[in-house]
């Protein structure tokens, strides 16, 4: 039977991608349905209890700038907040928070249940309704059919998921949850390229069996950082420390002696695992010169006795896992409450997607999260938001939107996936962005909130706060530009006390702040340049904008040059065999990838600058040279 009411957008899956997709579509005013096999696991953290980190924190801030959920949820659930790379430049500083799993899930569910235009429904999806290469709905396991103008697949590791512990394996979407086998089979019938990937998780330890007294503590930062632009530290629950232990030669011997029982090394697992989050087996074998690896013991929550040992993801048999755990300092008597495991699952080639994350072959069908070959909550959330907003726009007969590489880490993520694809689980790093000086955590709102407002994602309260911040920044910069000090002034000695080279000529507040040794706090502590802004975010922005003004201007010039190529569109139906002068290799790669623009084509491996020049000349000759707005 058909459900009586049609929807604009259906989201399949309630993880980090699915919840962001559902919130985005509903915020934009579209009638949205979120289908999940279990409402109680909405926003579940399947692996590590943490949000953020290098590159990942940038994505969370961007999701927040576009009105998303993740940053606000972790502000209410974070039990330890830190700024990573705090001593380095602003481009690579990143926020990270340990999470209370239960509080995080509660924060996500509360937001979903209070979001207008959004309906939750508990049923596993087994089929899609596709008519004339267009998706028009979904079918649940009890045969109930839902109609919609767009469908977003955010199914994580559930598609034909297979869990491995030692040489034993069984079907599962994650520990304790069933896999989605019928939907996997249905998707394999569609004209989509599919492969297998693998990820893993460590065993969980009973905290009461760990001797923390012999371990080093790691505390959060004080003052506590905040993730959301709209958040504040008073929202954070009780803060707790993490602890640090290490593997040792005994640990490594246990692993080496049992490699024949590892499903990866025995050839049982076919899927490729994440390069930047390897299993402990991989670390021991790949870094054989290391006699120890640092392991962080992270609490899973304020009301839980479980500890997440970050760094010993494994699929070795349970008896070997026990030996590994008990070989480490402080854990000689530790008990495992959940075994570690590896999981293999289907993923679909993201090169078959448009930058909006809509399928090139099935109209109205969007993909987001691990199904696209990524790993990590943050990467999933960012894709979910993008897919959800574009599903909403499609259902309203509006053009899709995707950020450029120069606008957001989300733009880098999507461009990497859709242009290059991936053969291993993809995670975000700041090093993946060529314009990272422009793509900082601190300016995510300046880059994206106005766009989010235009898209219908940003509410009135956030918009008012954002504009107030802009006004504070502009007013303070003007004040510093117009406040001067001369070498002969009475307070010049106070200024010189903060400078490595004394004043030799008249200088404005901005001139002084531009000096490497002068901070905004020091400058505004001087009577001539007081008072400091009360808005700490605006004050930080003033300092960064002034100190890095020259570098930022130079990078902006580079971006504008690149945009000329980036915005030169390529016809989706162009057969590159028609372009004389291109090599057979380039023709094959362009016909395979079908890039949307010259910029995208230039990033395909093997497509040379000479080939791009030939293509531009041919397009001009054919009268097909056009640029997007």
From Swiss-Prot:
The keyword tRNA processing applies. NAD(+) binds at residues 273-287. GO terms for biological process: tRNA methylation; tRNA wobble uridine modification. Pfam families: GIDA (PF01134), GIDA_C_1st (PF21680), SAM_GIDA_C (PF13932). Its main location: cytoplasm. It comes from the Bacteria. PROSITE patterns: GIDA_1 (PS01280), GIDA_2 (PS01281). One of its GO terms (molecular function) is flavin adenine dinucleotide binding. One of its GO terms (cellular component) is cytosol. Its cofactor is FAD. InterPro entries: FAD/NAD-bd_sf (IPR036188), GIDA_C_N (IPR049312), MnmG (IPR004416), MnmG-rel (IPR002218), MnmG-rel_CS (IPR020595), MnmG_C (IPR026904), MnmG_C_subdom (IPR047001), MnmG_C_subdom_sf (IPR044920). SMART domains: GIDA_assoc_3. The keyword NAD applies. It is found in: Cytoplasm. FAD binds at residues 13-18, 125, 180, 370. Keywords: Cytoplasm, FAD, Flavoprotein, NAD, tRNA processing. NAD-binding protein involved in the addition of a carboxymethylaminomethyl (cmnm) group at the wobble position (U34) of certain tRNAs, forming tRNA-cmnm(5)s(2)U34. Belongs to the MnmG family. Homodimer. Heterotetramer of two MnmE and two MnmG subunits. This is tRNA uridine 5-carboxymethylaminomethyl modification enzyme MnmG. It comes from Salmonella arizonae (strain ATCC BAA-731 / CDC346-86 / RSK2980).
């Amino acid at each position: 039977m058909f459900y009586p009411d049609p929807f604009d957008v259906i989201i399949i899956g309630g993880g980090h991608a699915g919840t962001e997709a559902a919130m985005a579509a509903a915020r934009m005013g579209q009638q949205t349905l979120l289908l999940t096999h279990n409402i109680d696991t909405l926003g579940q953290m399947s692996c590590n209890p943490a949000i953020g980190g290098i590159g990942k924190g940038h994505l969370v801030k961007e999701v927040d700038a576009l009105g998303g959920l993740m940053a606000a949820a972790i502000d209410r659930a974070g039990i330890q907040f830190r700024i990573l790379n705090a001593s380095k430049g602003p481009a690579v500083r990143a926020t990270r928070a340990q999470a209370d799993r239960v509080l995080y899930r509660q924060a996500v569910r509360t937001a979903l249940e209070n979001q207008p235009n959004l309906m939750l429904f508990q049923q596993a999806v087994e089929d899609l309704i596709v008519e004339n290469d267009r998706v028009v709905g979904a079918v649940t396991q009890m045969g109930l059919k839902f109609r919609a103008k767009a469908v977003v697949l955010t199914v994580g590791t559930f598609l034909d998921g297979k869990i491995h512990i030692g040489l034993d394996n069984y079907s599962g979407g994650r520990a304790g949850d069933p896999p989605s086998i019928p939907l996997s089979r249905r998707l394999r019938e569609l004209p989509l390229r599919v492969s297998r990937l693998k990820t893993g998780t460590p065993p969980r330890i009973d905290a009461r069996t760990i001797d923390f007294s012999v371990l080093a503590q790691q505390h959060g930062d004080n003052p506590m950082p905040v993730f959301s632009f709209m958040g504040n530290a008073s929202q954070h629950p009780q803060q707790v420390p993490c602890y640090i232990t290490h593997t040792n030669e005994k640990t490594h011997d246990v692993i080496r002696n049992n490699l024949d029982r590892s499903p990866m090394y025995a050839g049982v697992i076919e899927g490729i695992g994440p390069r930047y989050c390897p299993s402990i087996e991989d670390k021991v074998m790949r870094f054989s010169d290391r006699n120890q690896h640092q392991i962080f013991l992270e609490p899973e929550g304020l009301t839980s006795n479980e500890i997440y040992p970050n760094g010993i993801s494994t699929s070795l048999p349970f008896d070997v896992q026990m030996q590994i755990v008990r070989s480490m300092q402080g854990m000689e008597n530790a008990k495992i409450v959940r075994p570690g495991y590896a999981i293999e699952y289907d993923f679909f080639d993201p090169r078959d997607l448009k930058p909006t994350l809509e399928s090139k072959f099935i109209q109205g069908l969007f993909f987001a999260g691990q199904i696209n070959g990524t790993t990590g909550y943050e990467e999933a959330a960012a894709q979910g938001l993008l897919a959800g907003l574009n599903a909403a726009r499609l259902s309203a007969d509006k053009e899709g939107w995707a950020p450029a590489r120069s606008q957001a880490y989300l733009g880098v993520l999507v461009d990497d996936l859709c242009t290059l694809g991936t053969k291993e689980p993809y995670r975000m790093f700041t090093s993946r962005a060529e314009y990272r000086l422009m793509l900082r955590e601190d300016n995510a709102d300046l880059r994206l909130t106005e766009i989010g407002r235009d898209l219908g994602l940003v509410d009135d309260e956030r918009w008012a706060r954002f504009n107030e911040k802009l006004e504070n920044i502009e007013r303070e910069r003007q004040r510093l530009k117009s406040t001067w000090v001369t070498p002969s002034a009475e307070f010049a000695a106070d200024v010189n006390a903060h400078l490595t080279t004394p004043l030799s000529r008249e200088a404005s507040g901005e001139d002084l702040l531009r000096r490497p040794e002068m901070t905004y706090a020091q400058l505004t502590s001087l009577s001539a340049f007081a008072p400091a802004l009360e808005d700490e975010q605006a004050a930080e922005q003033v300092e960064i904008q002034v100190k890095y003004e020259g570098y930022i201007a130079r990078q902006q010039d580079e971006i504008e040059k690149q945009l000329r190529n980036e915005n030169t569109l390529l016809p989706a139906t162009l057969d590159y065999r028609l372009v004389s002068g291109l090599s057979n290799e380039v023709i094959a790669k362009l016909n395979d990838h079908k890039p949307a623009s010259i910029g995208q084509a230039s990033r395909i491996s093997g497509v040379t600058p000479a080939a791009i020049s030939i293509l531009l000349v041919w397009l001009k000759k054919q009268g097909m040279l056009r640029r997007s707005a």
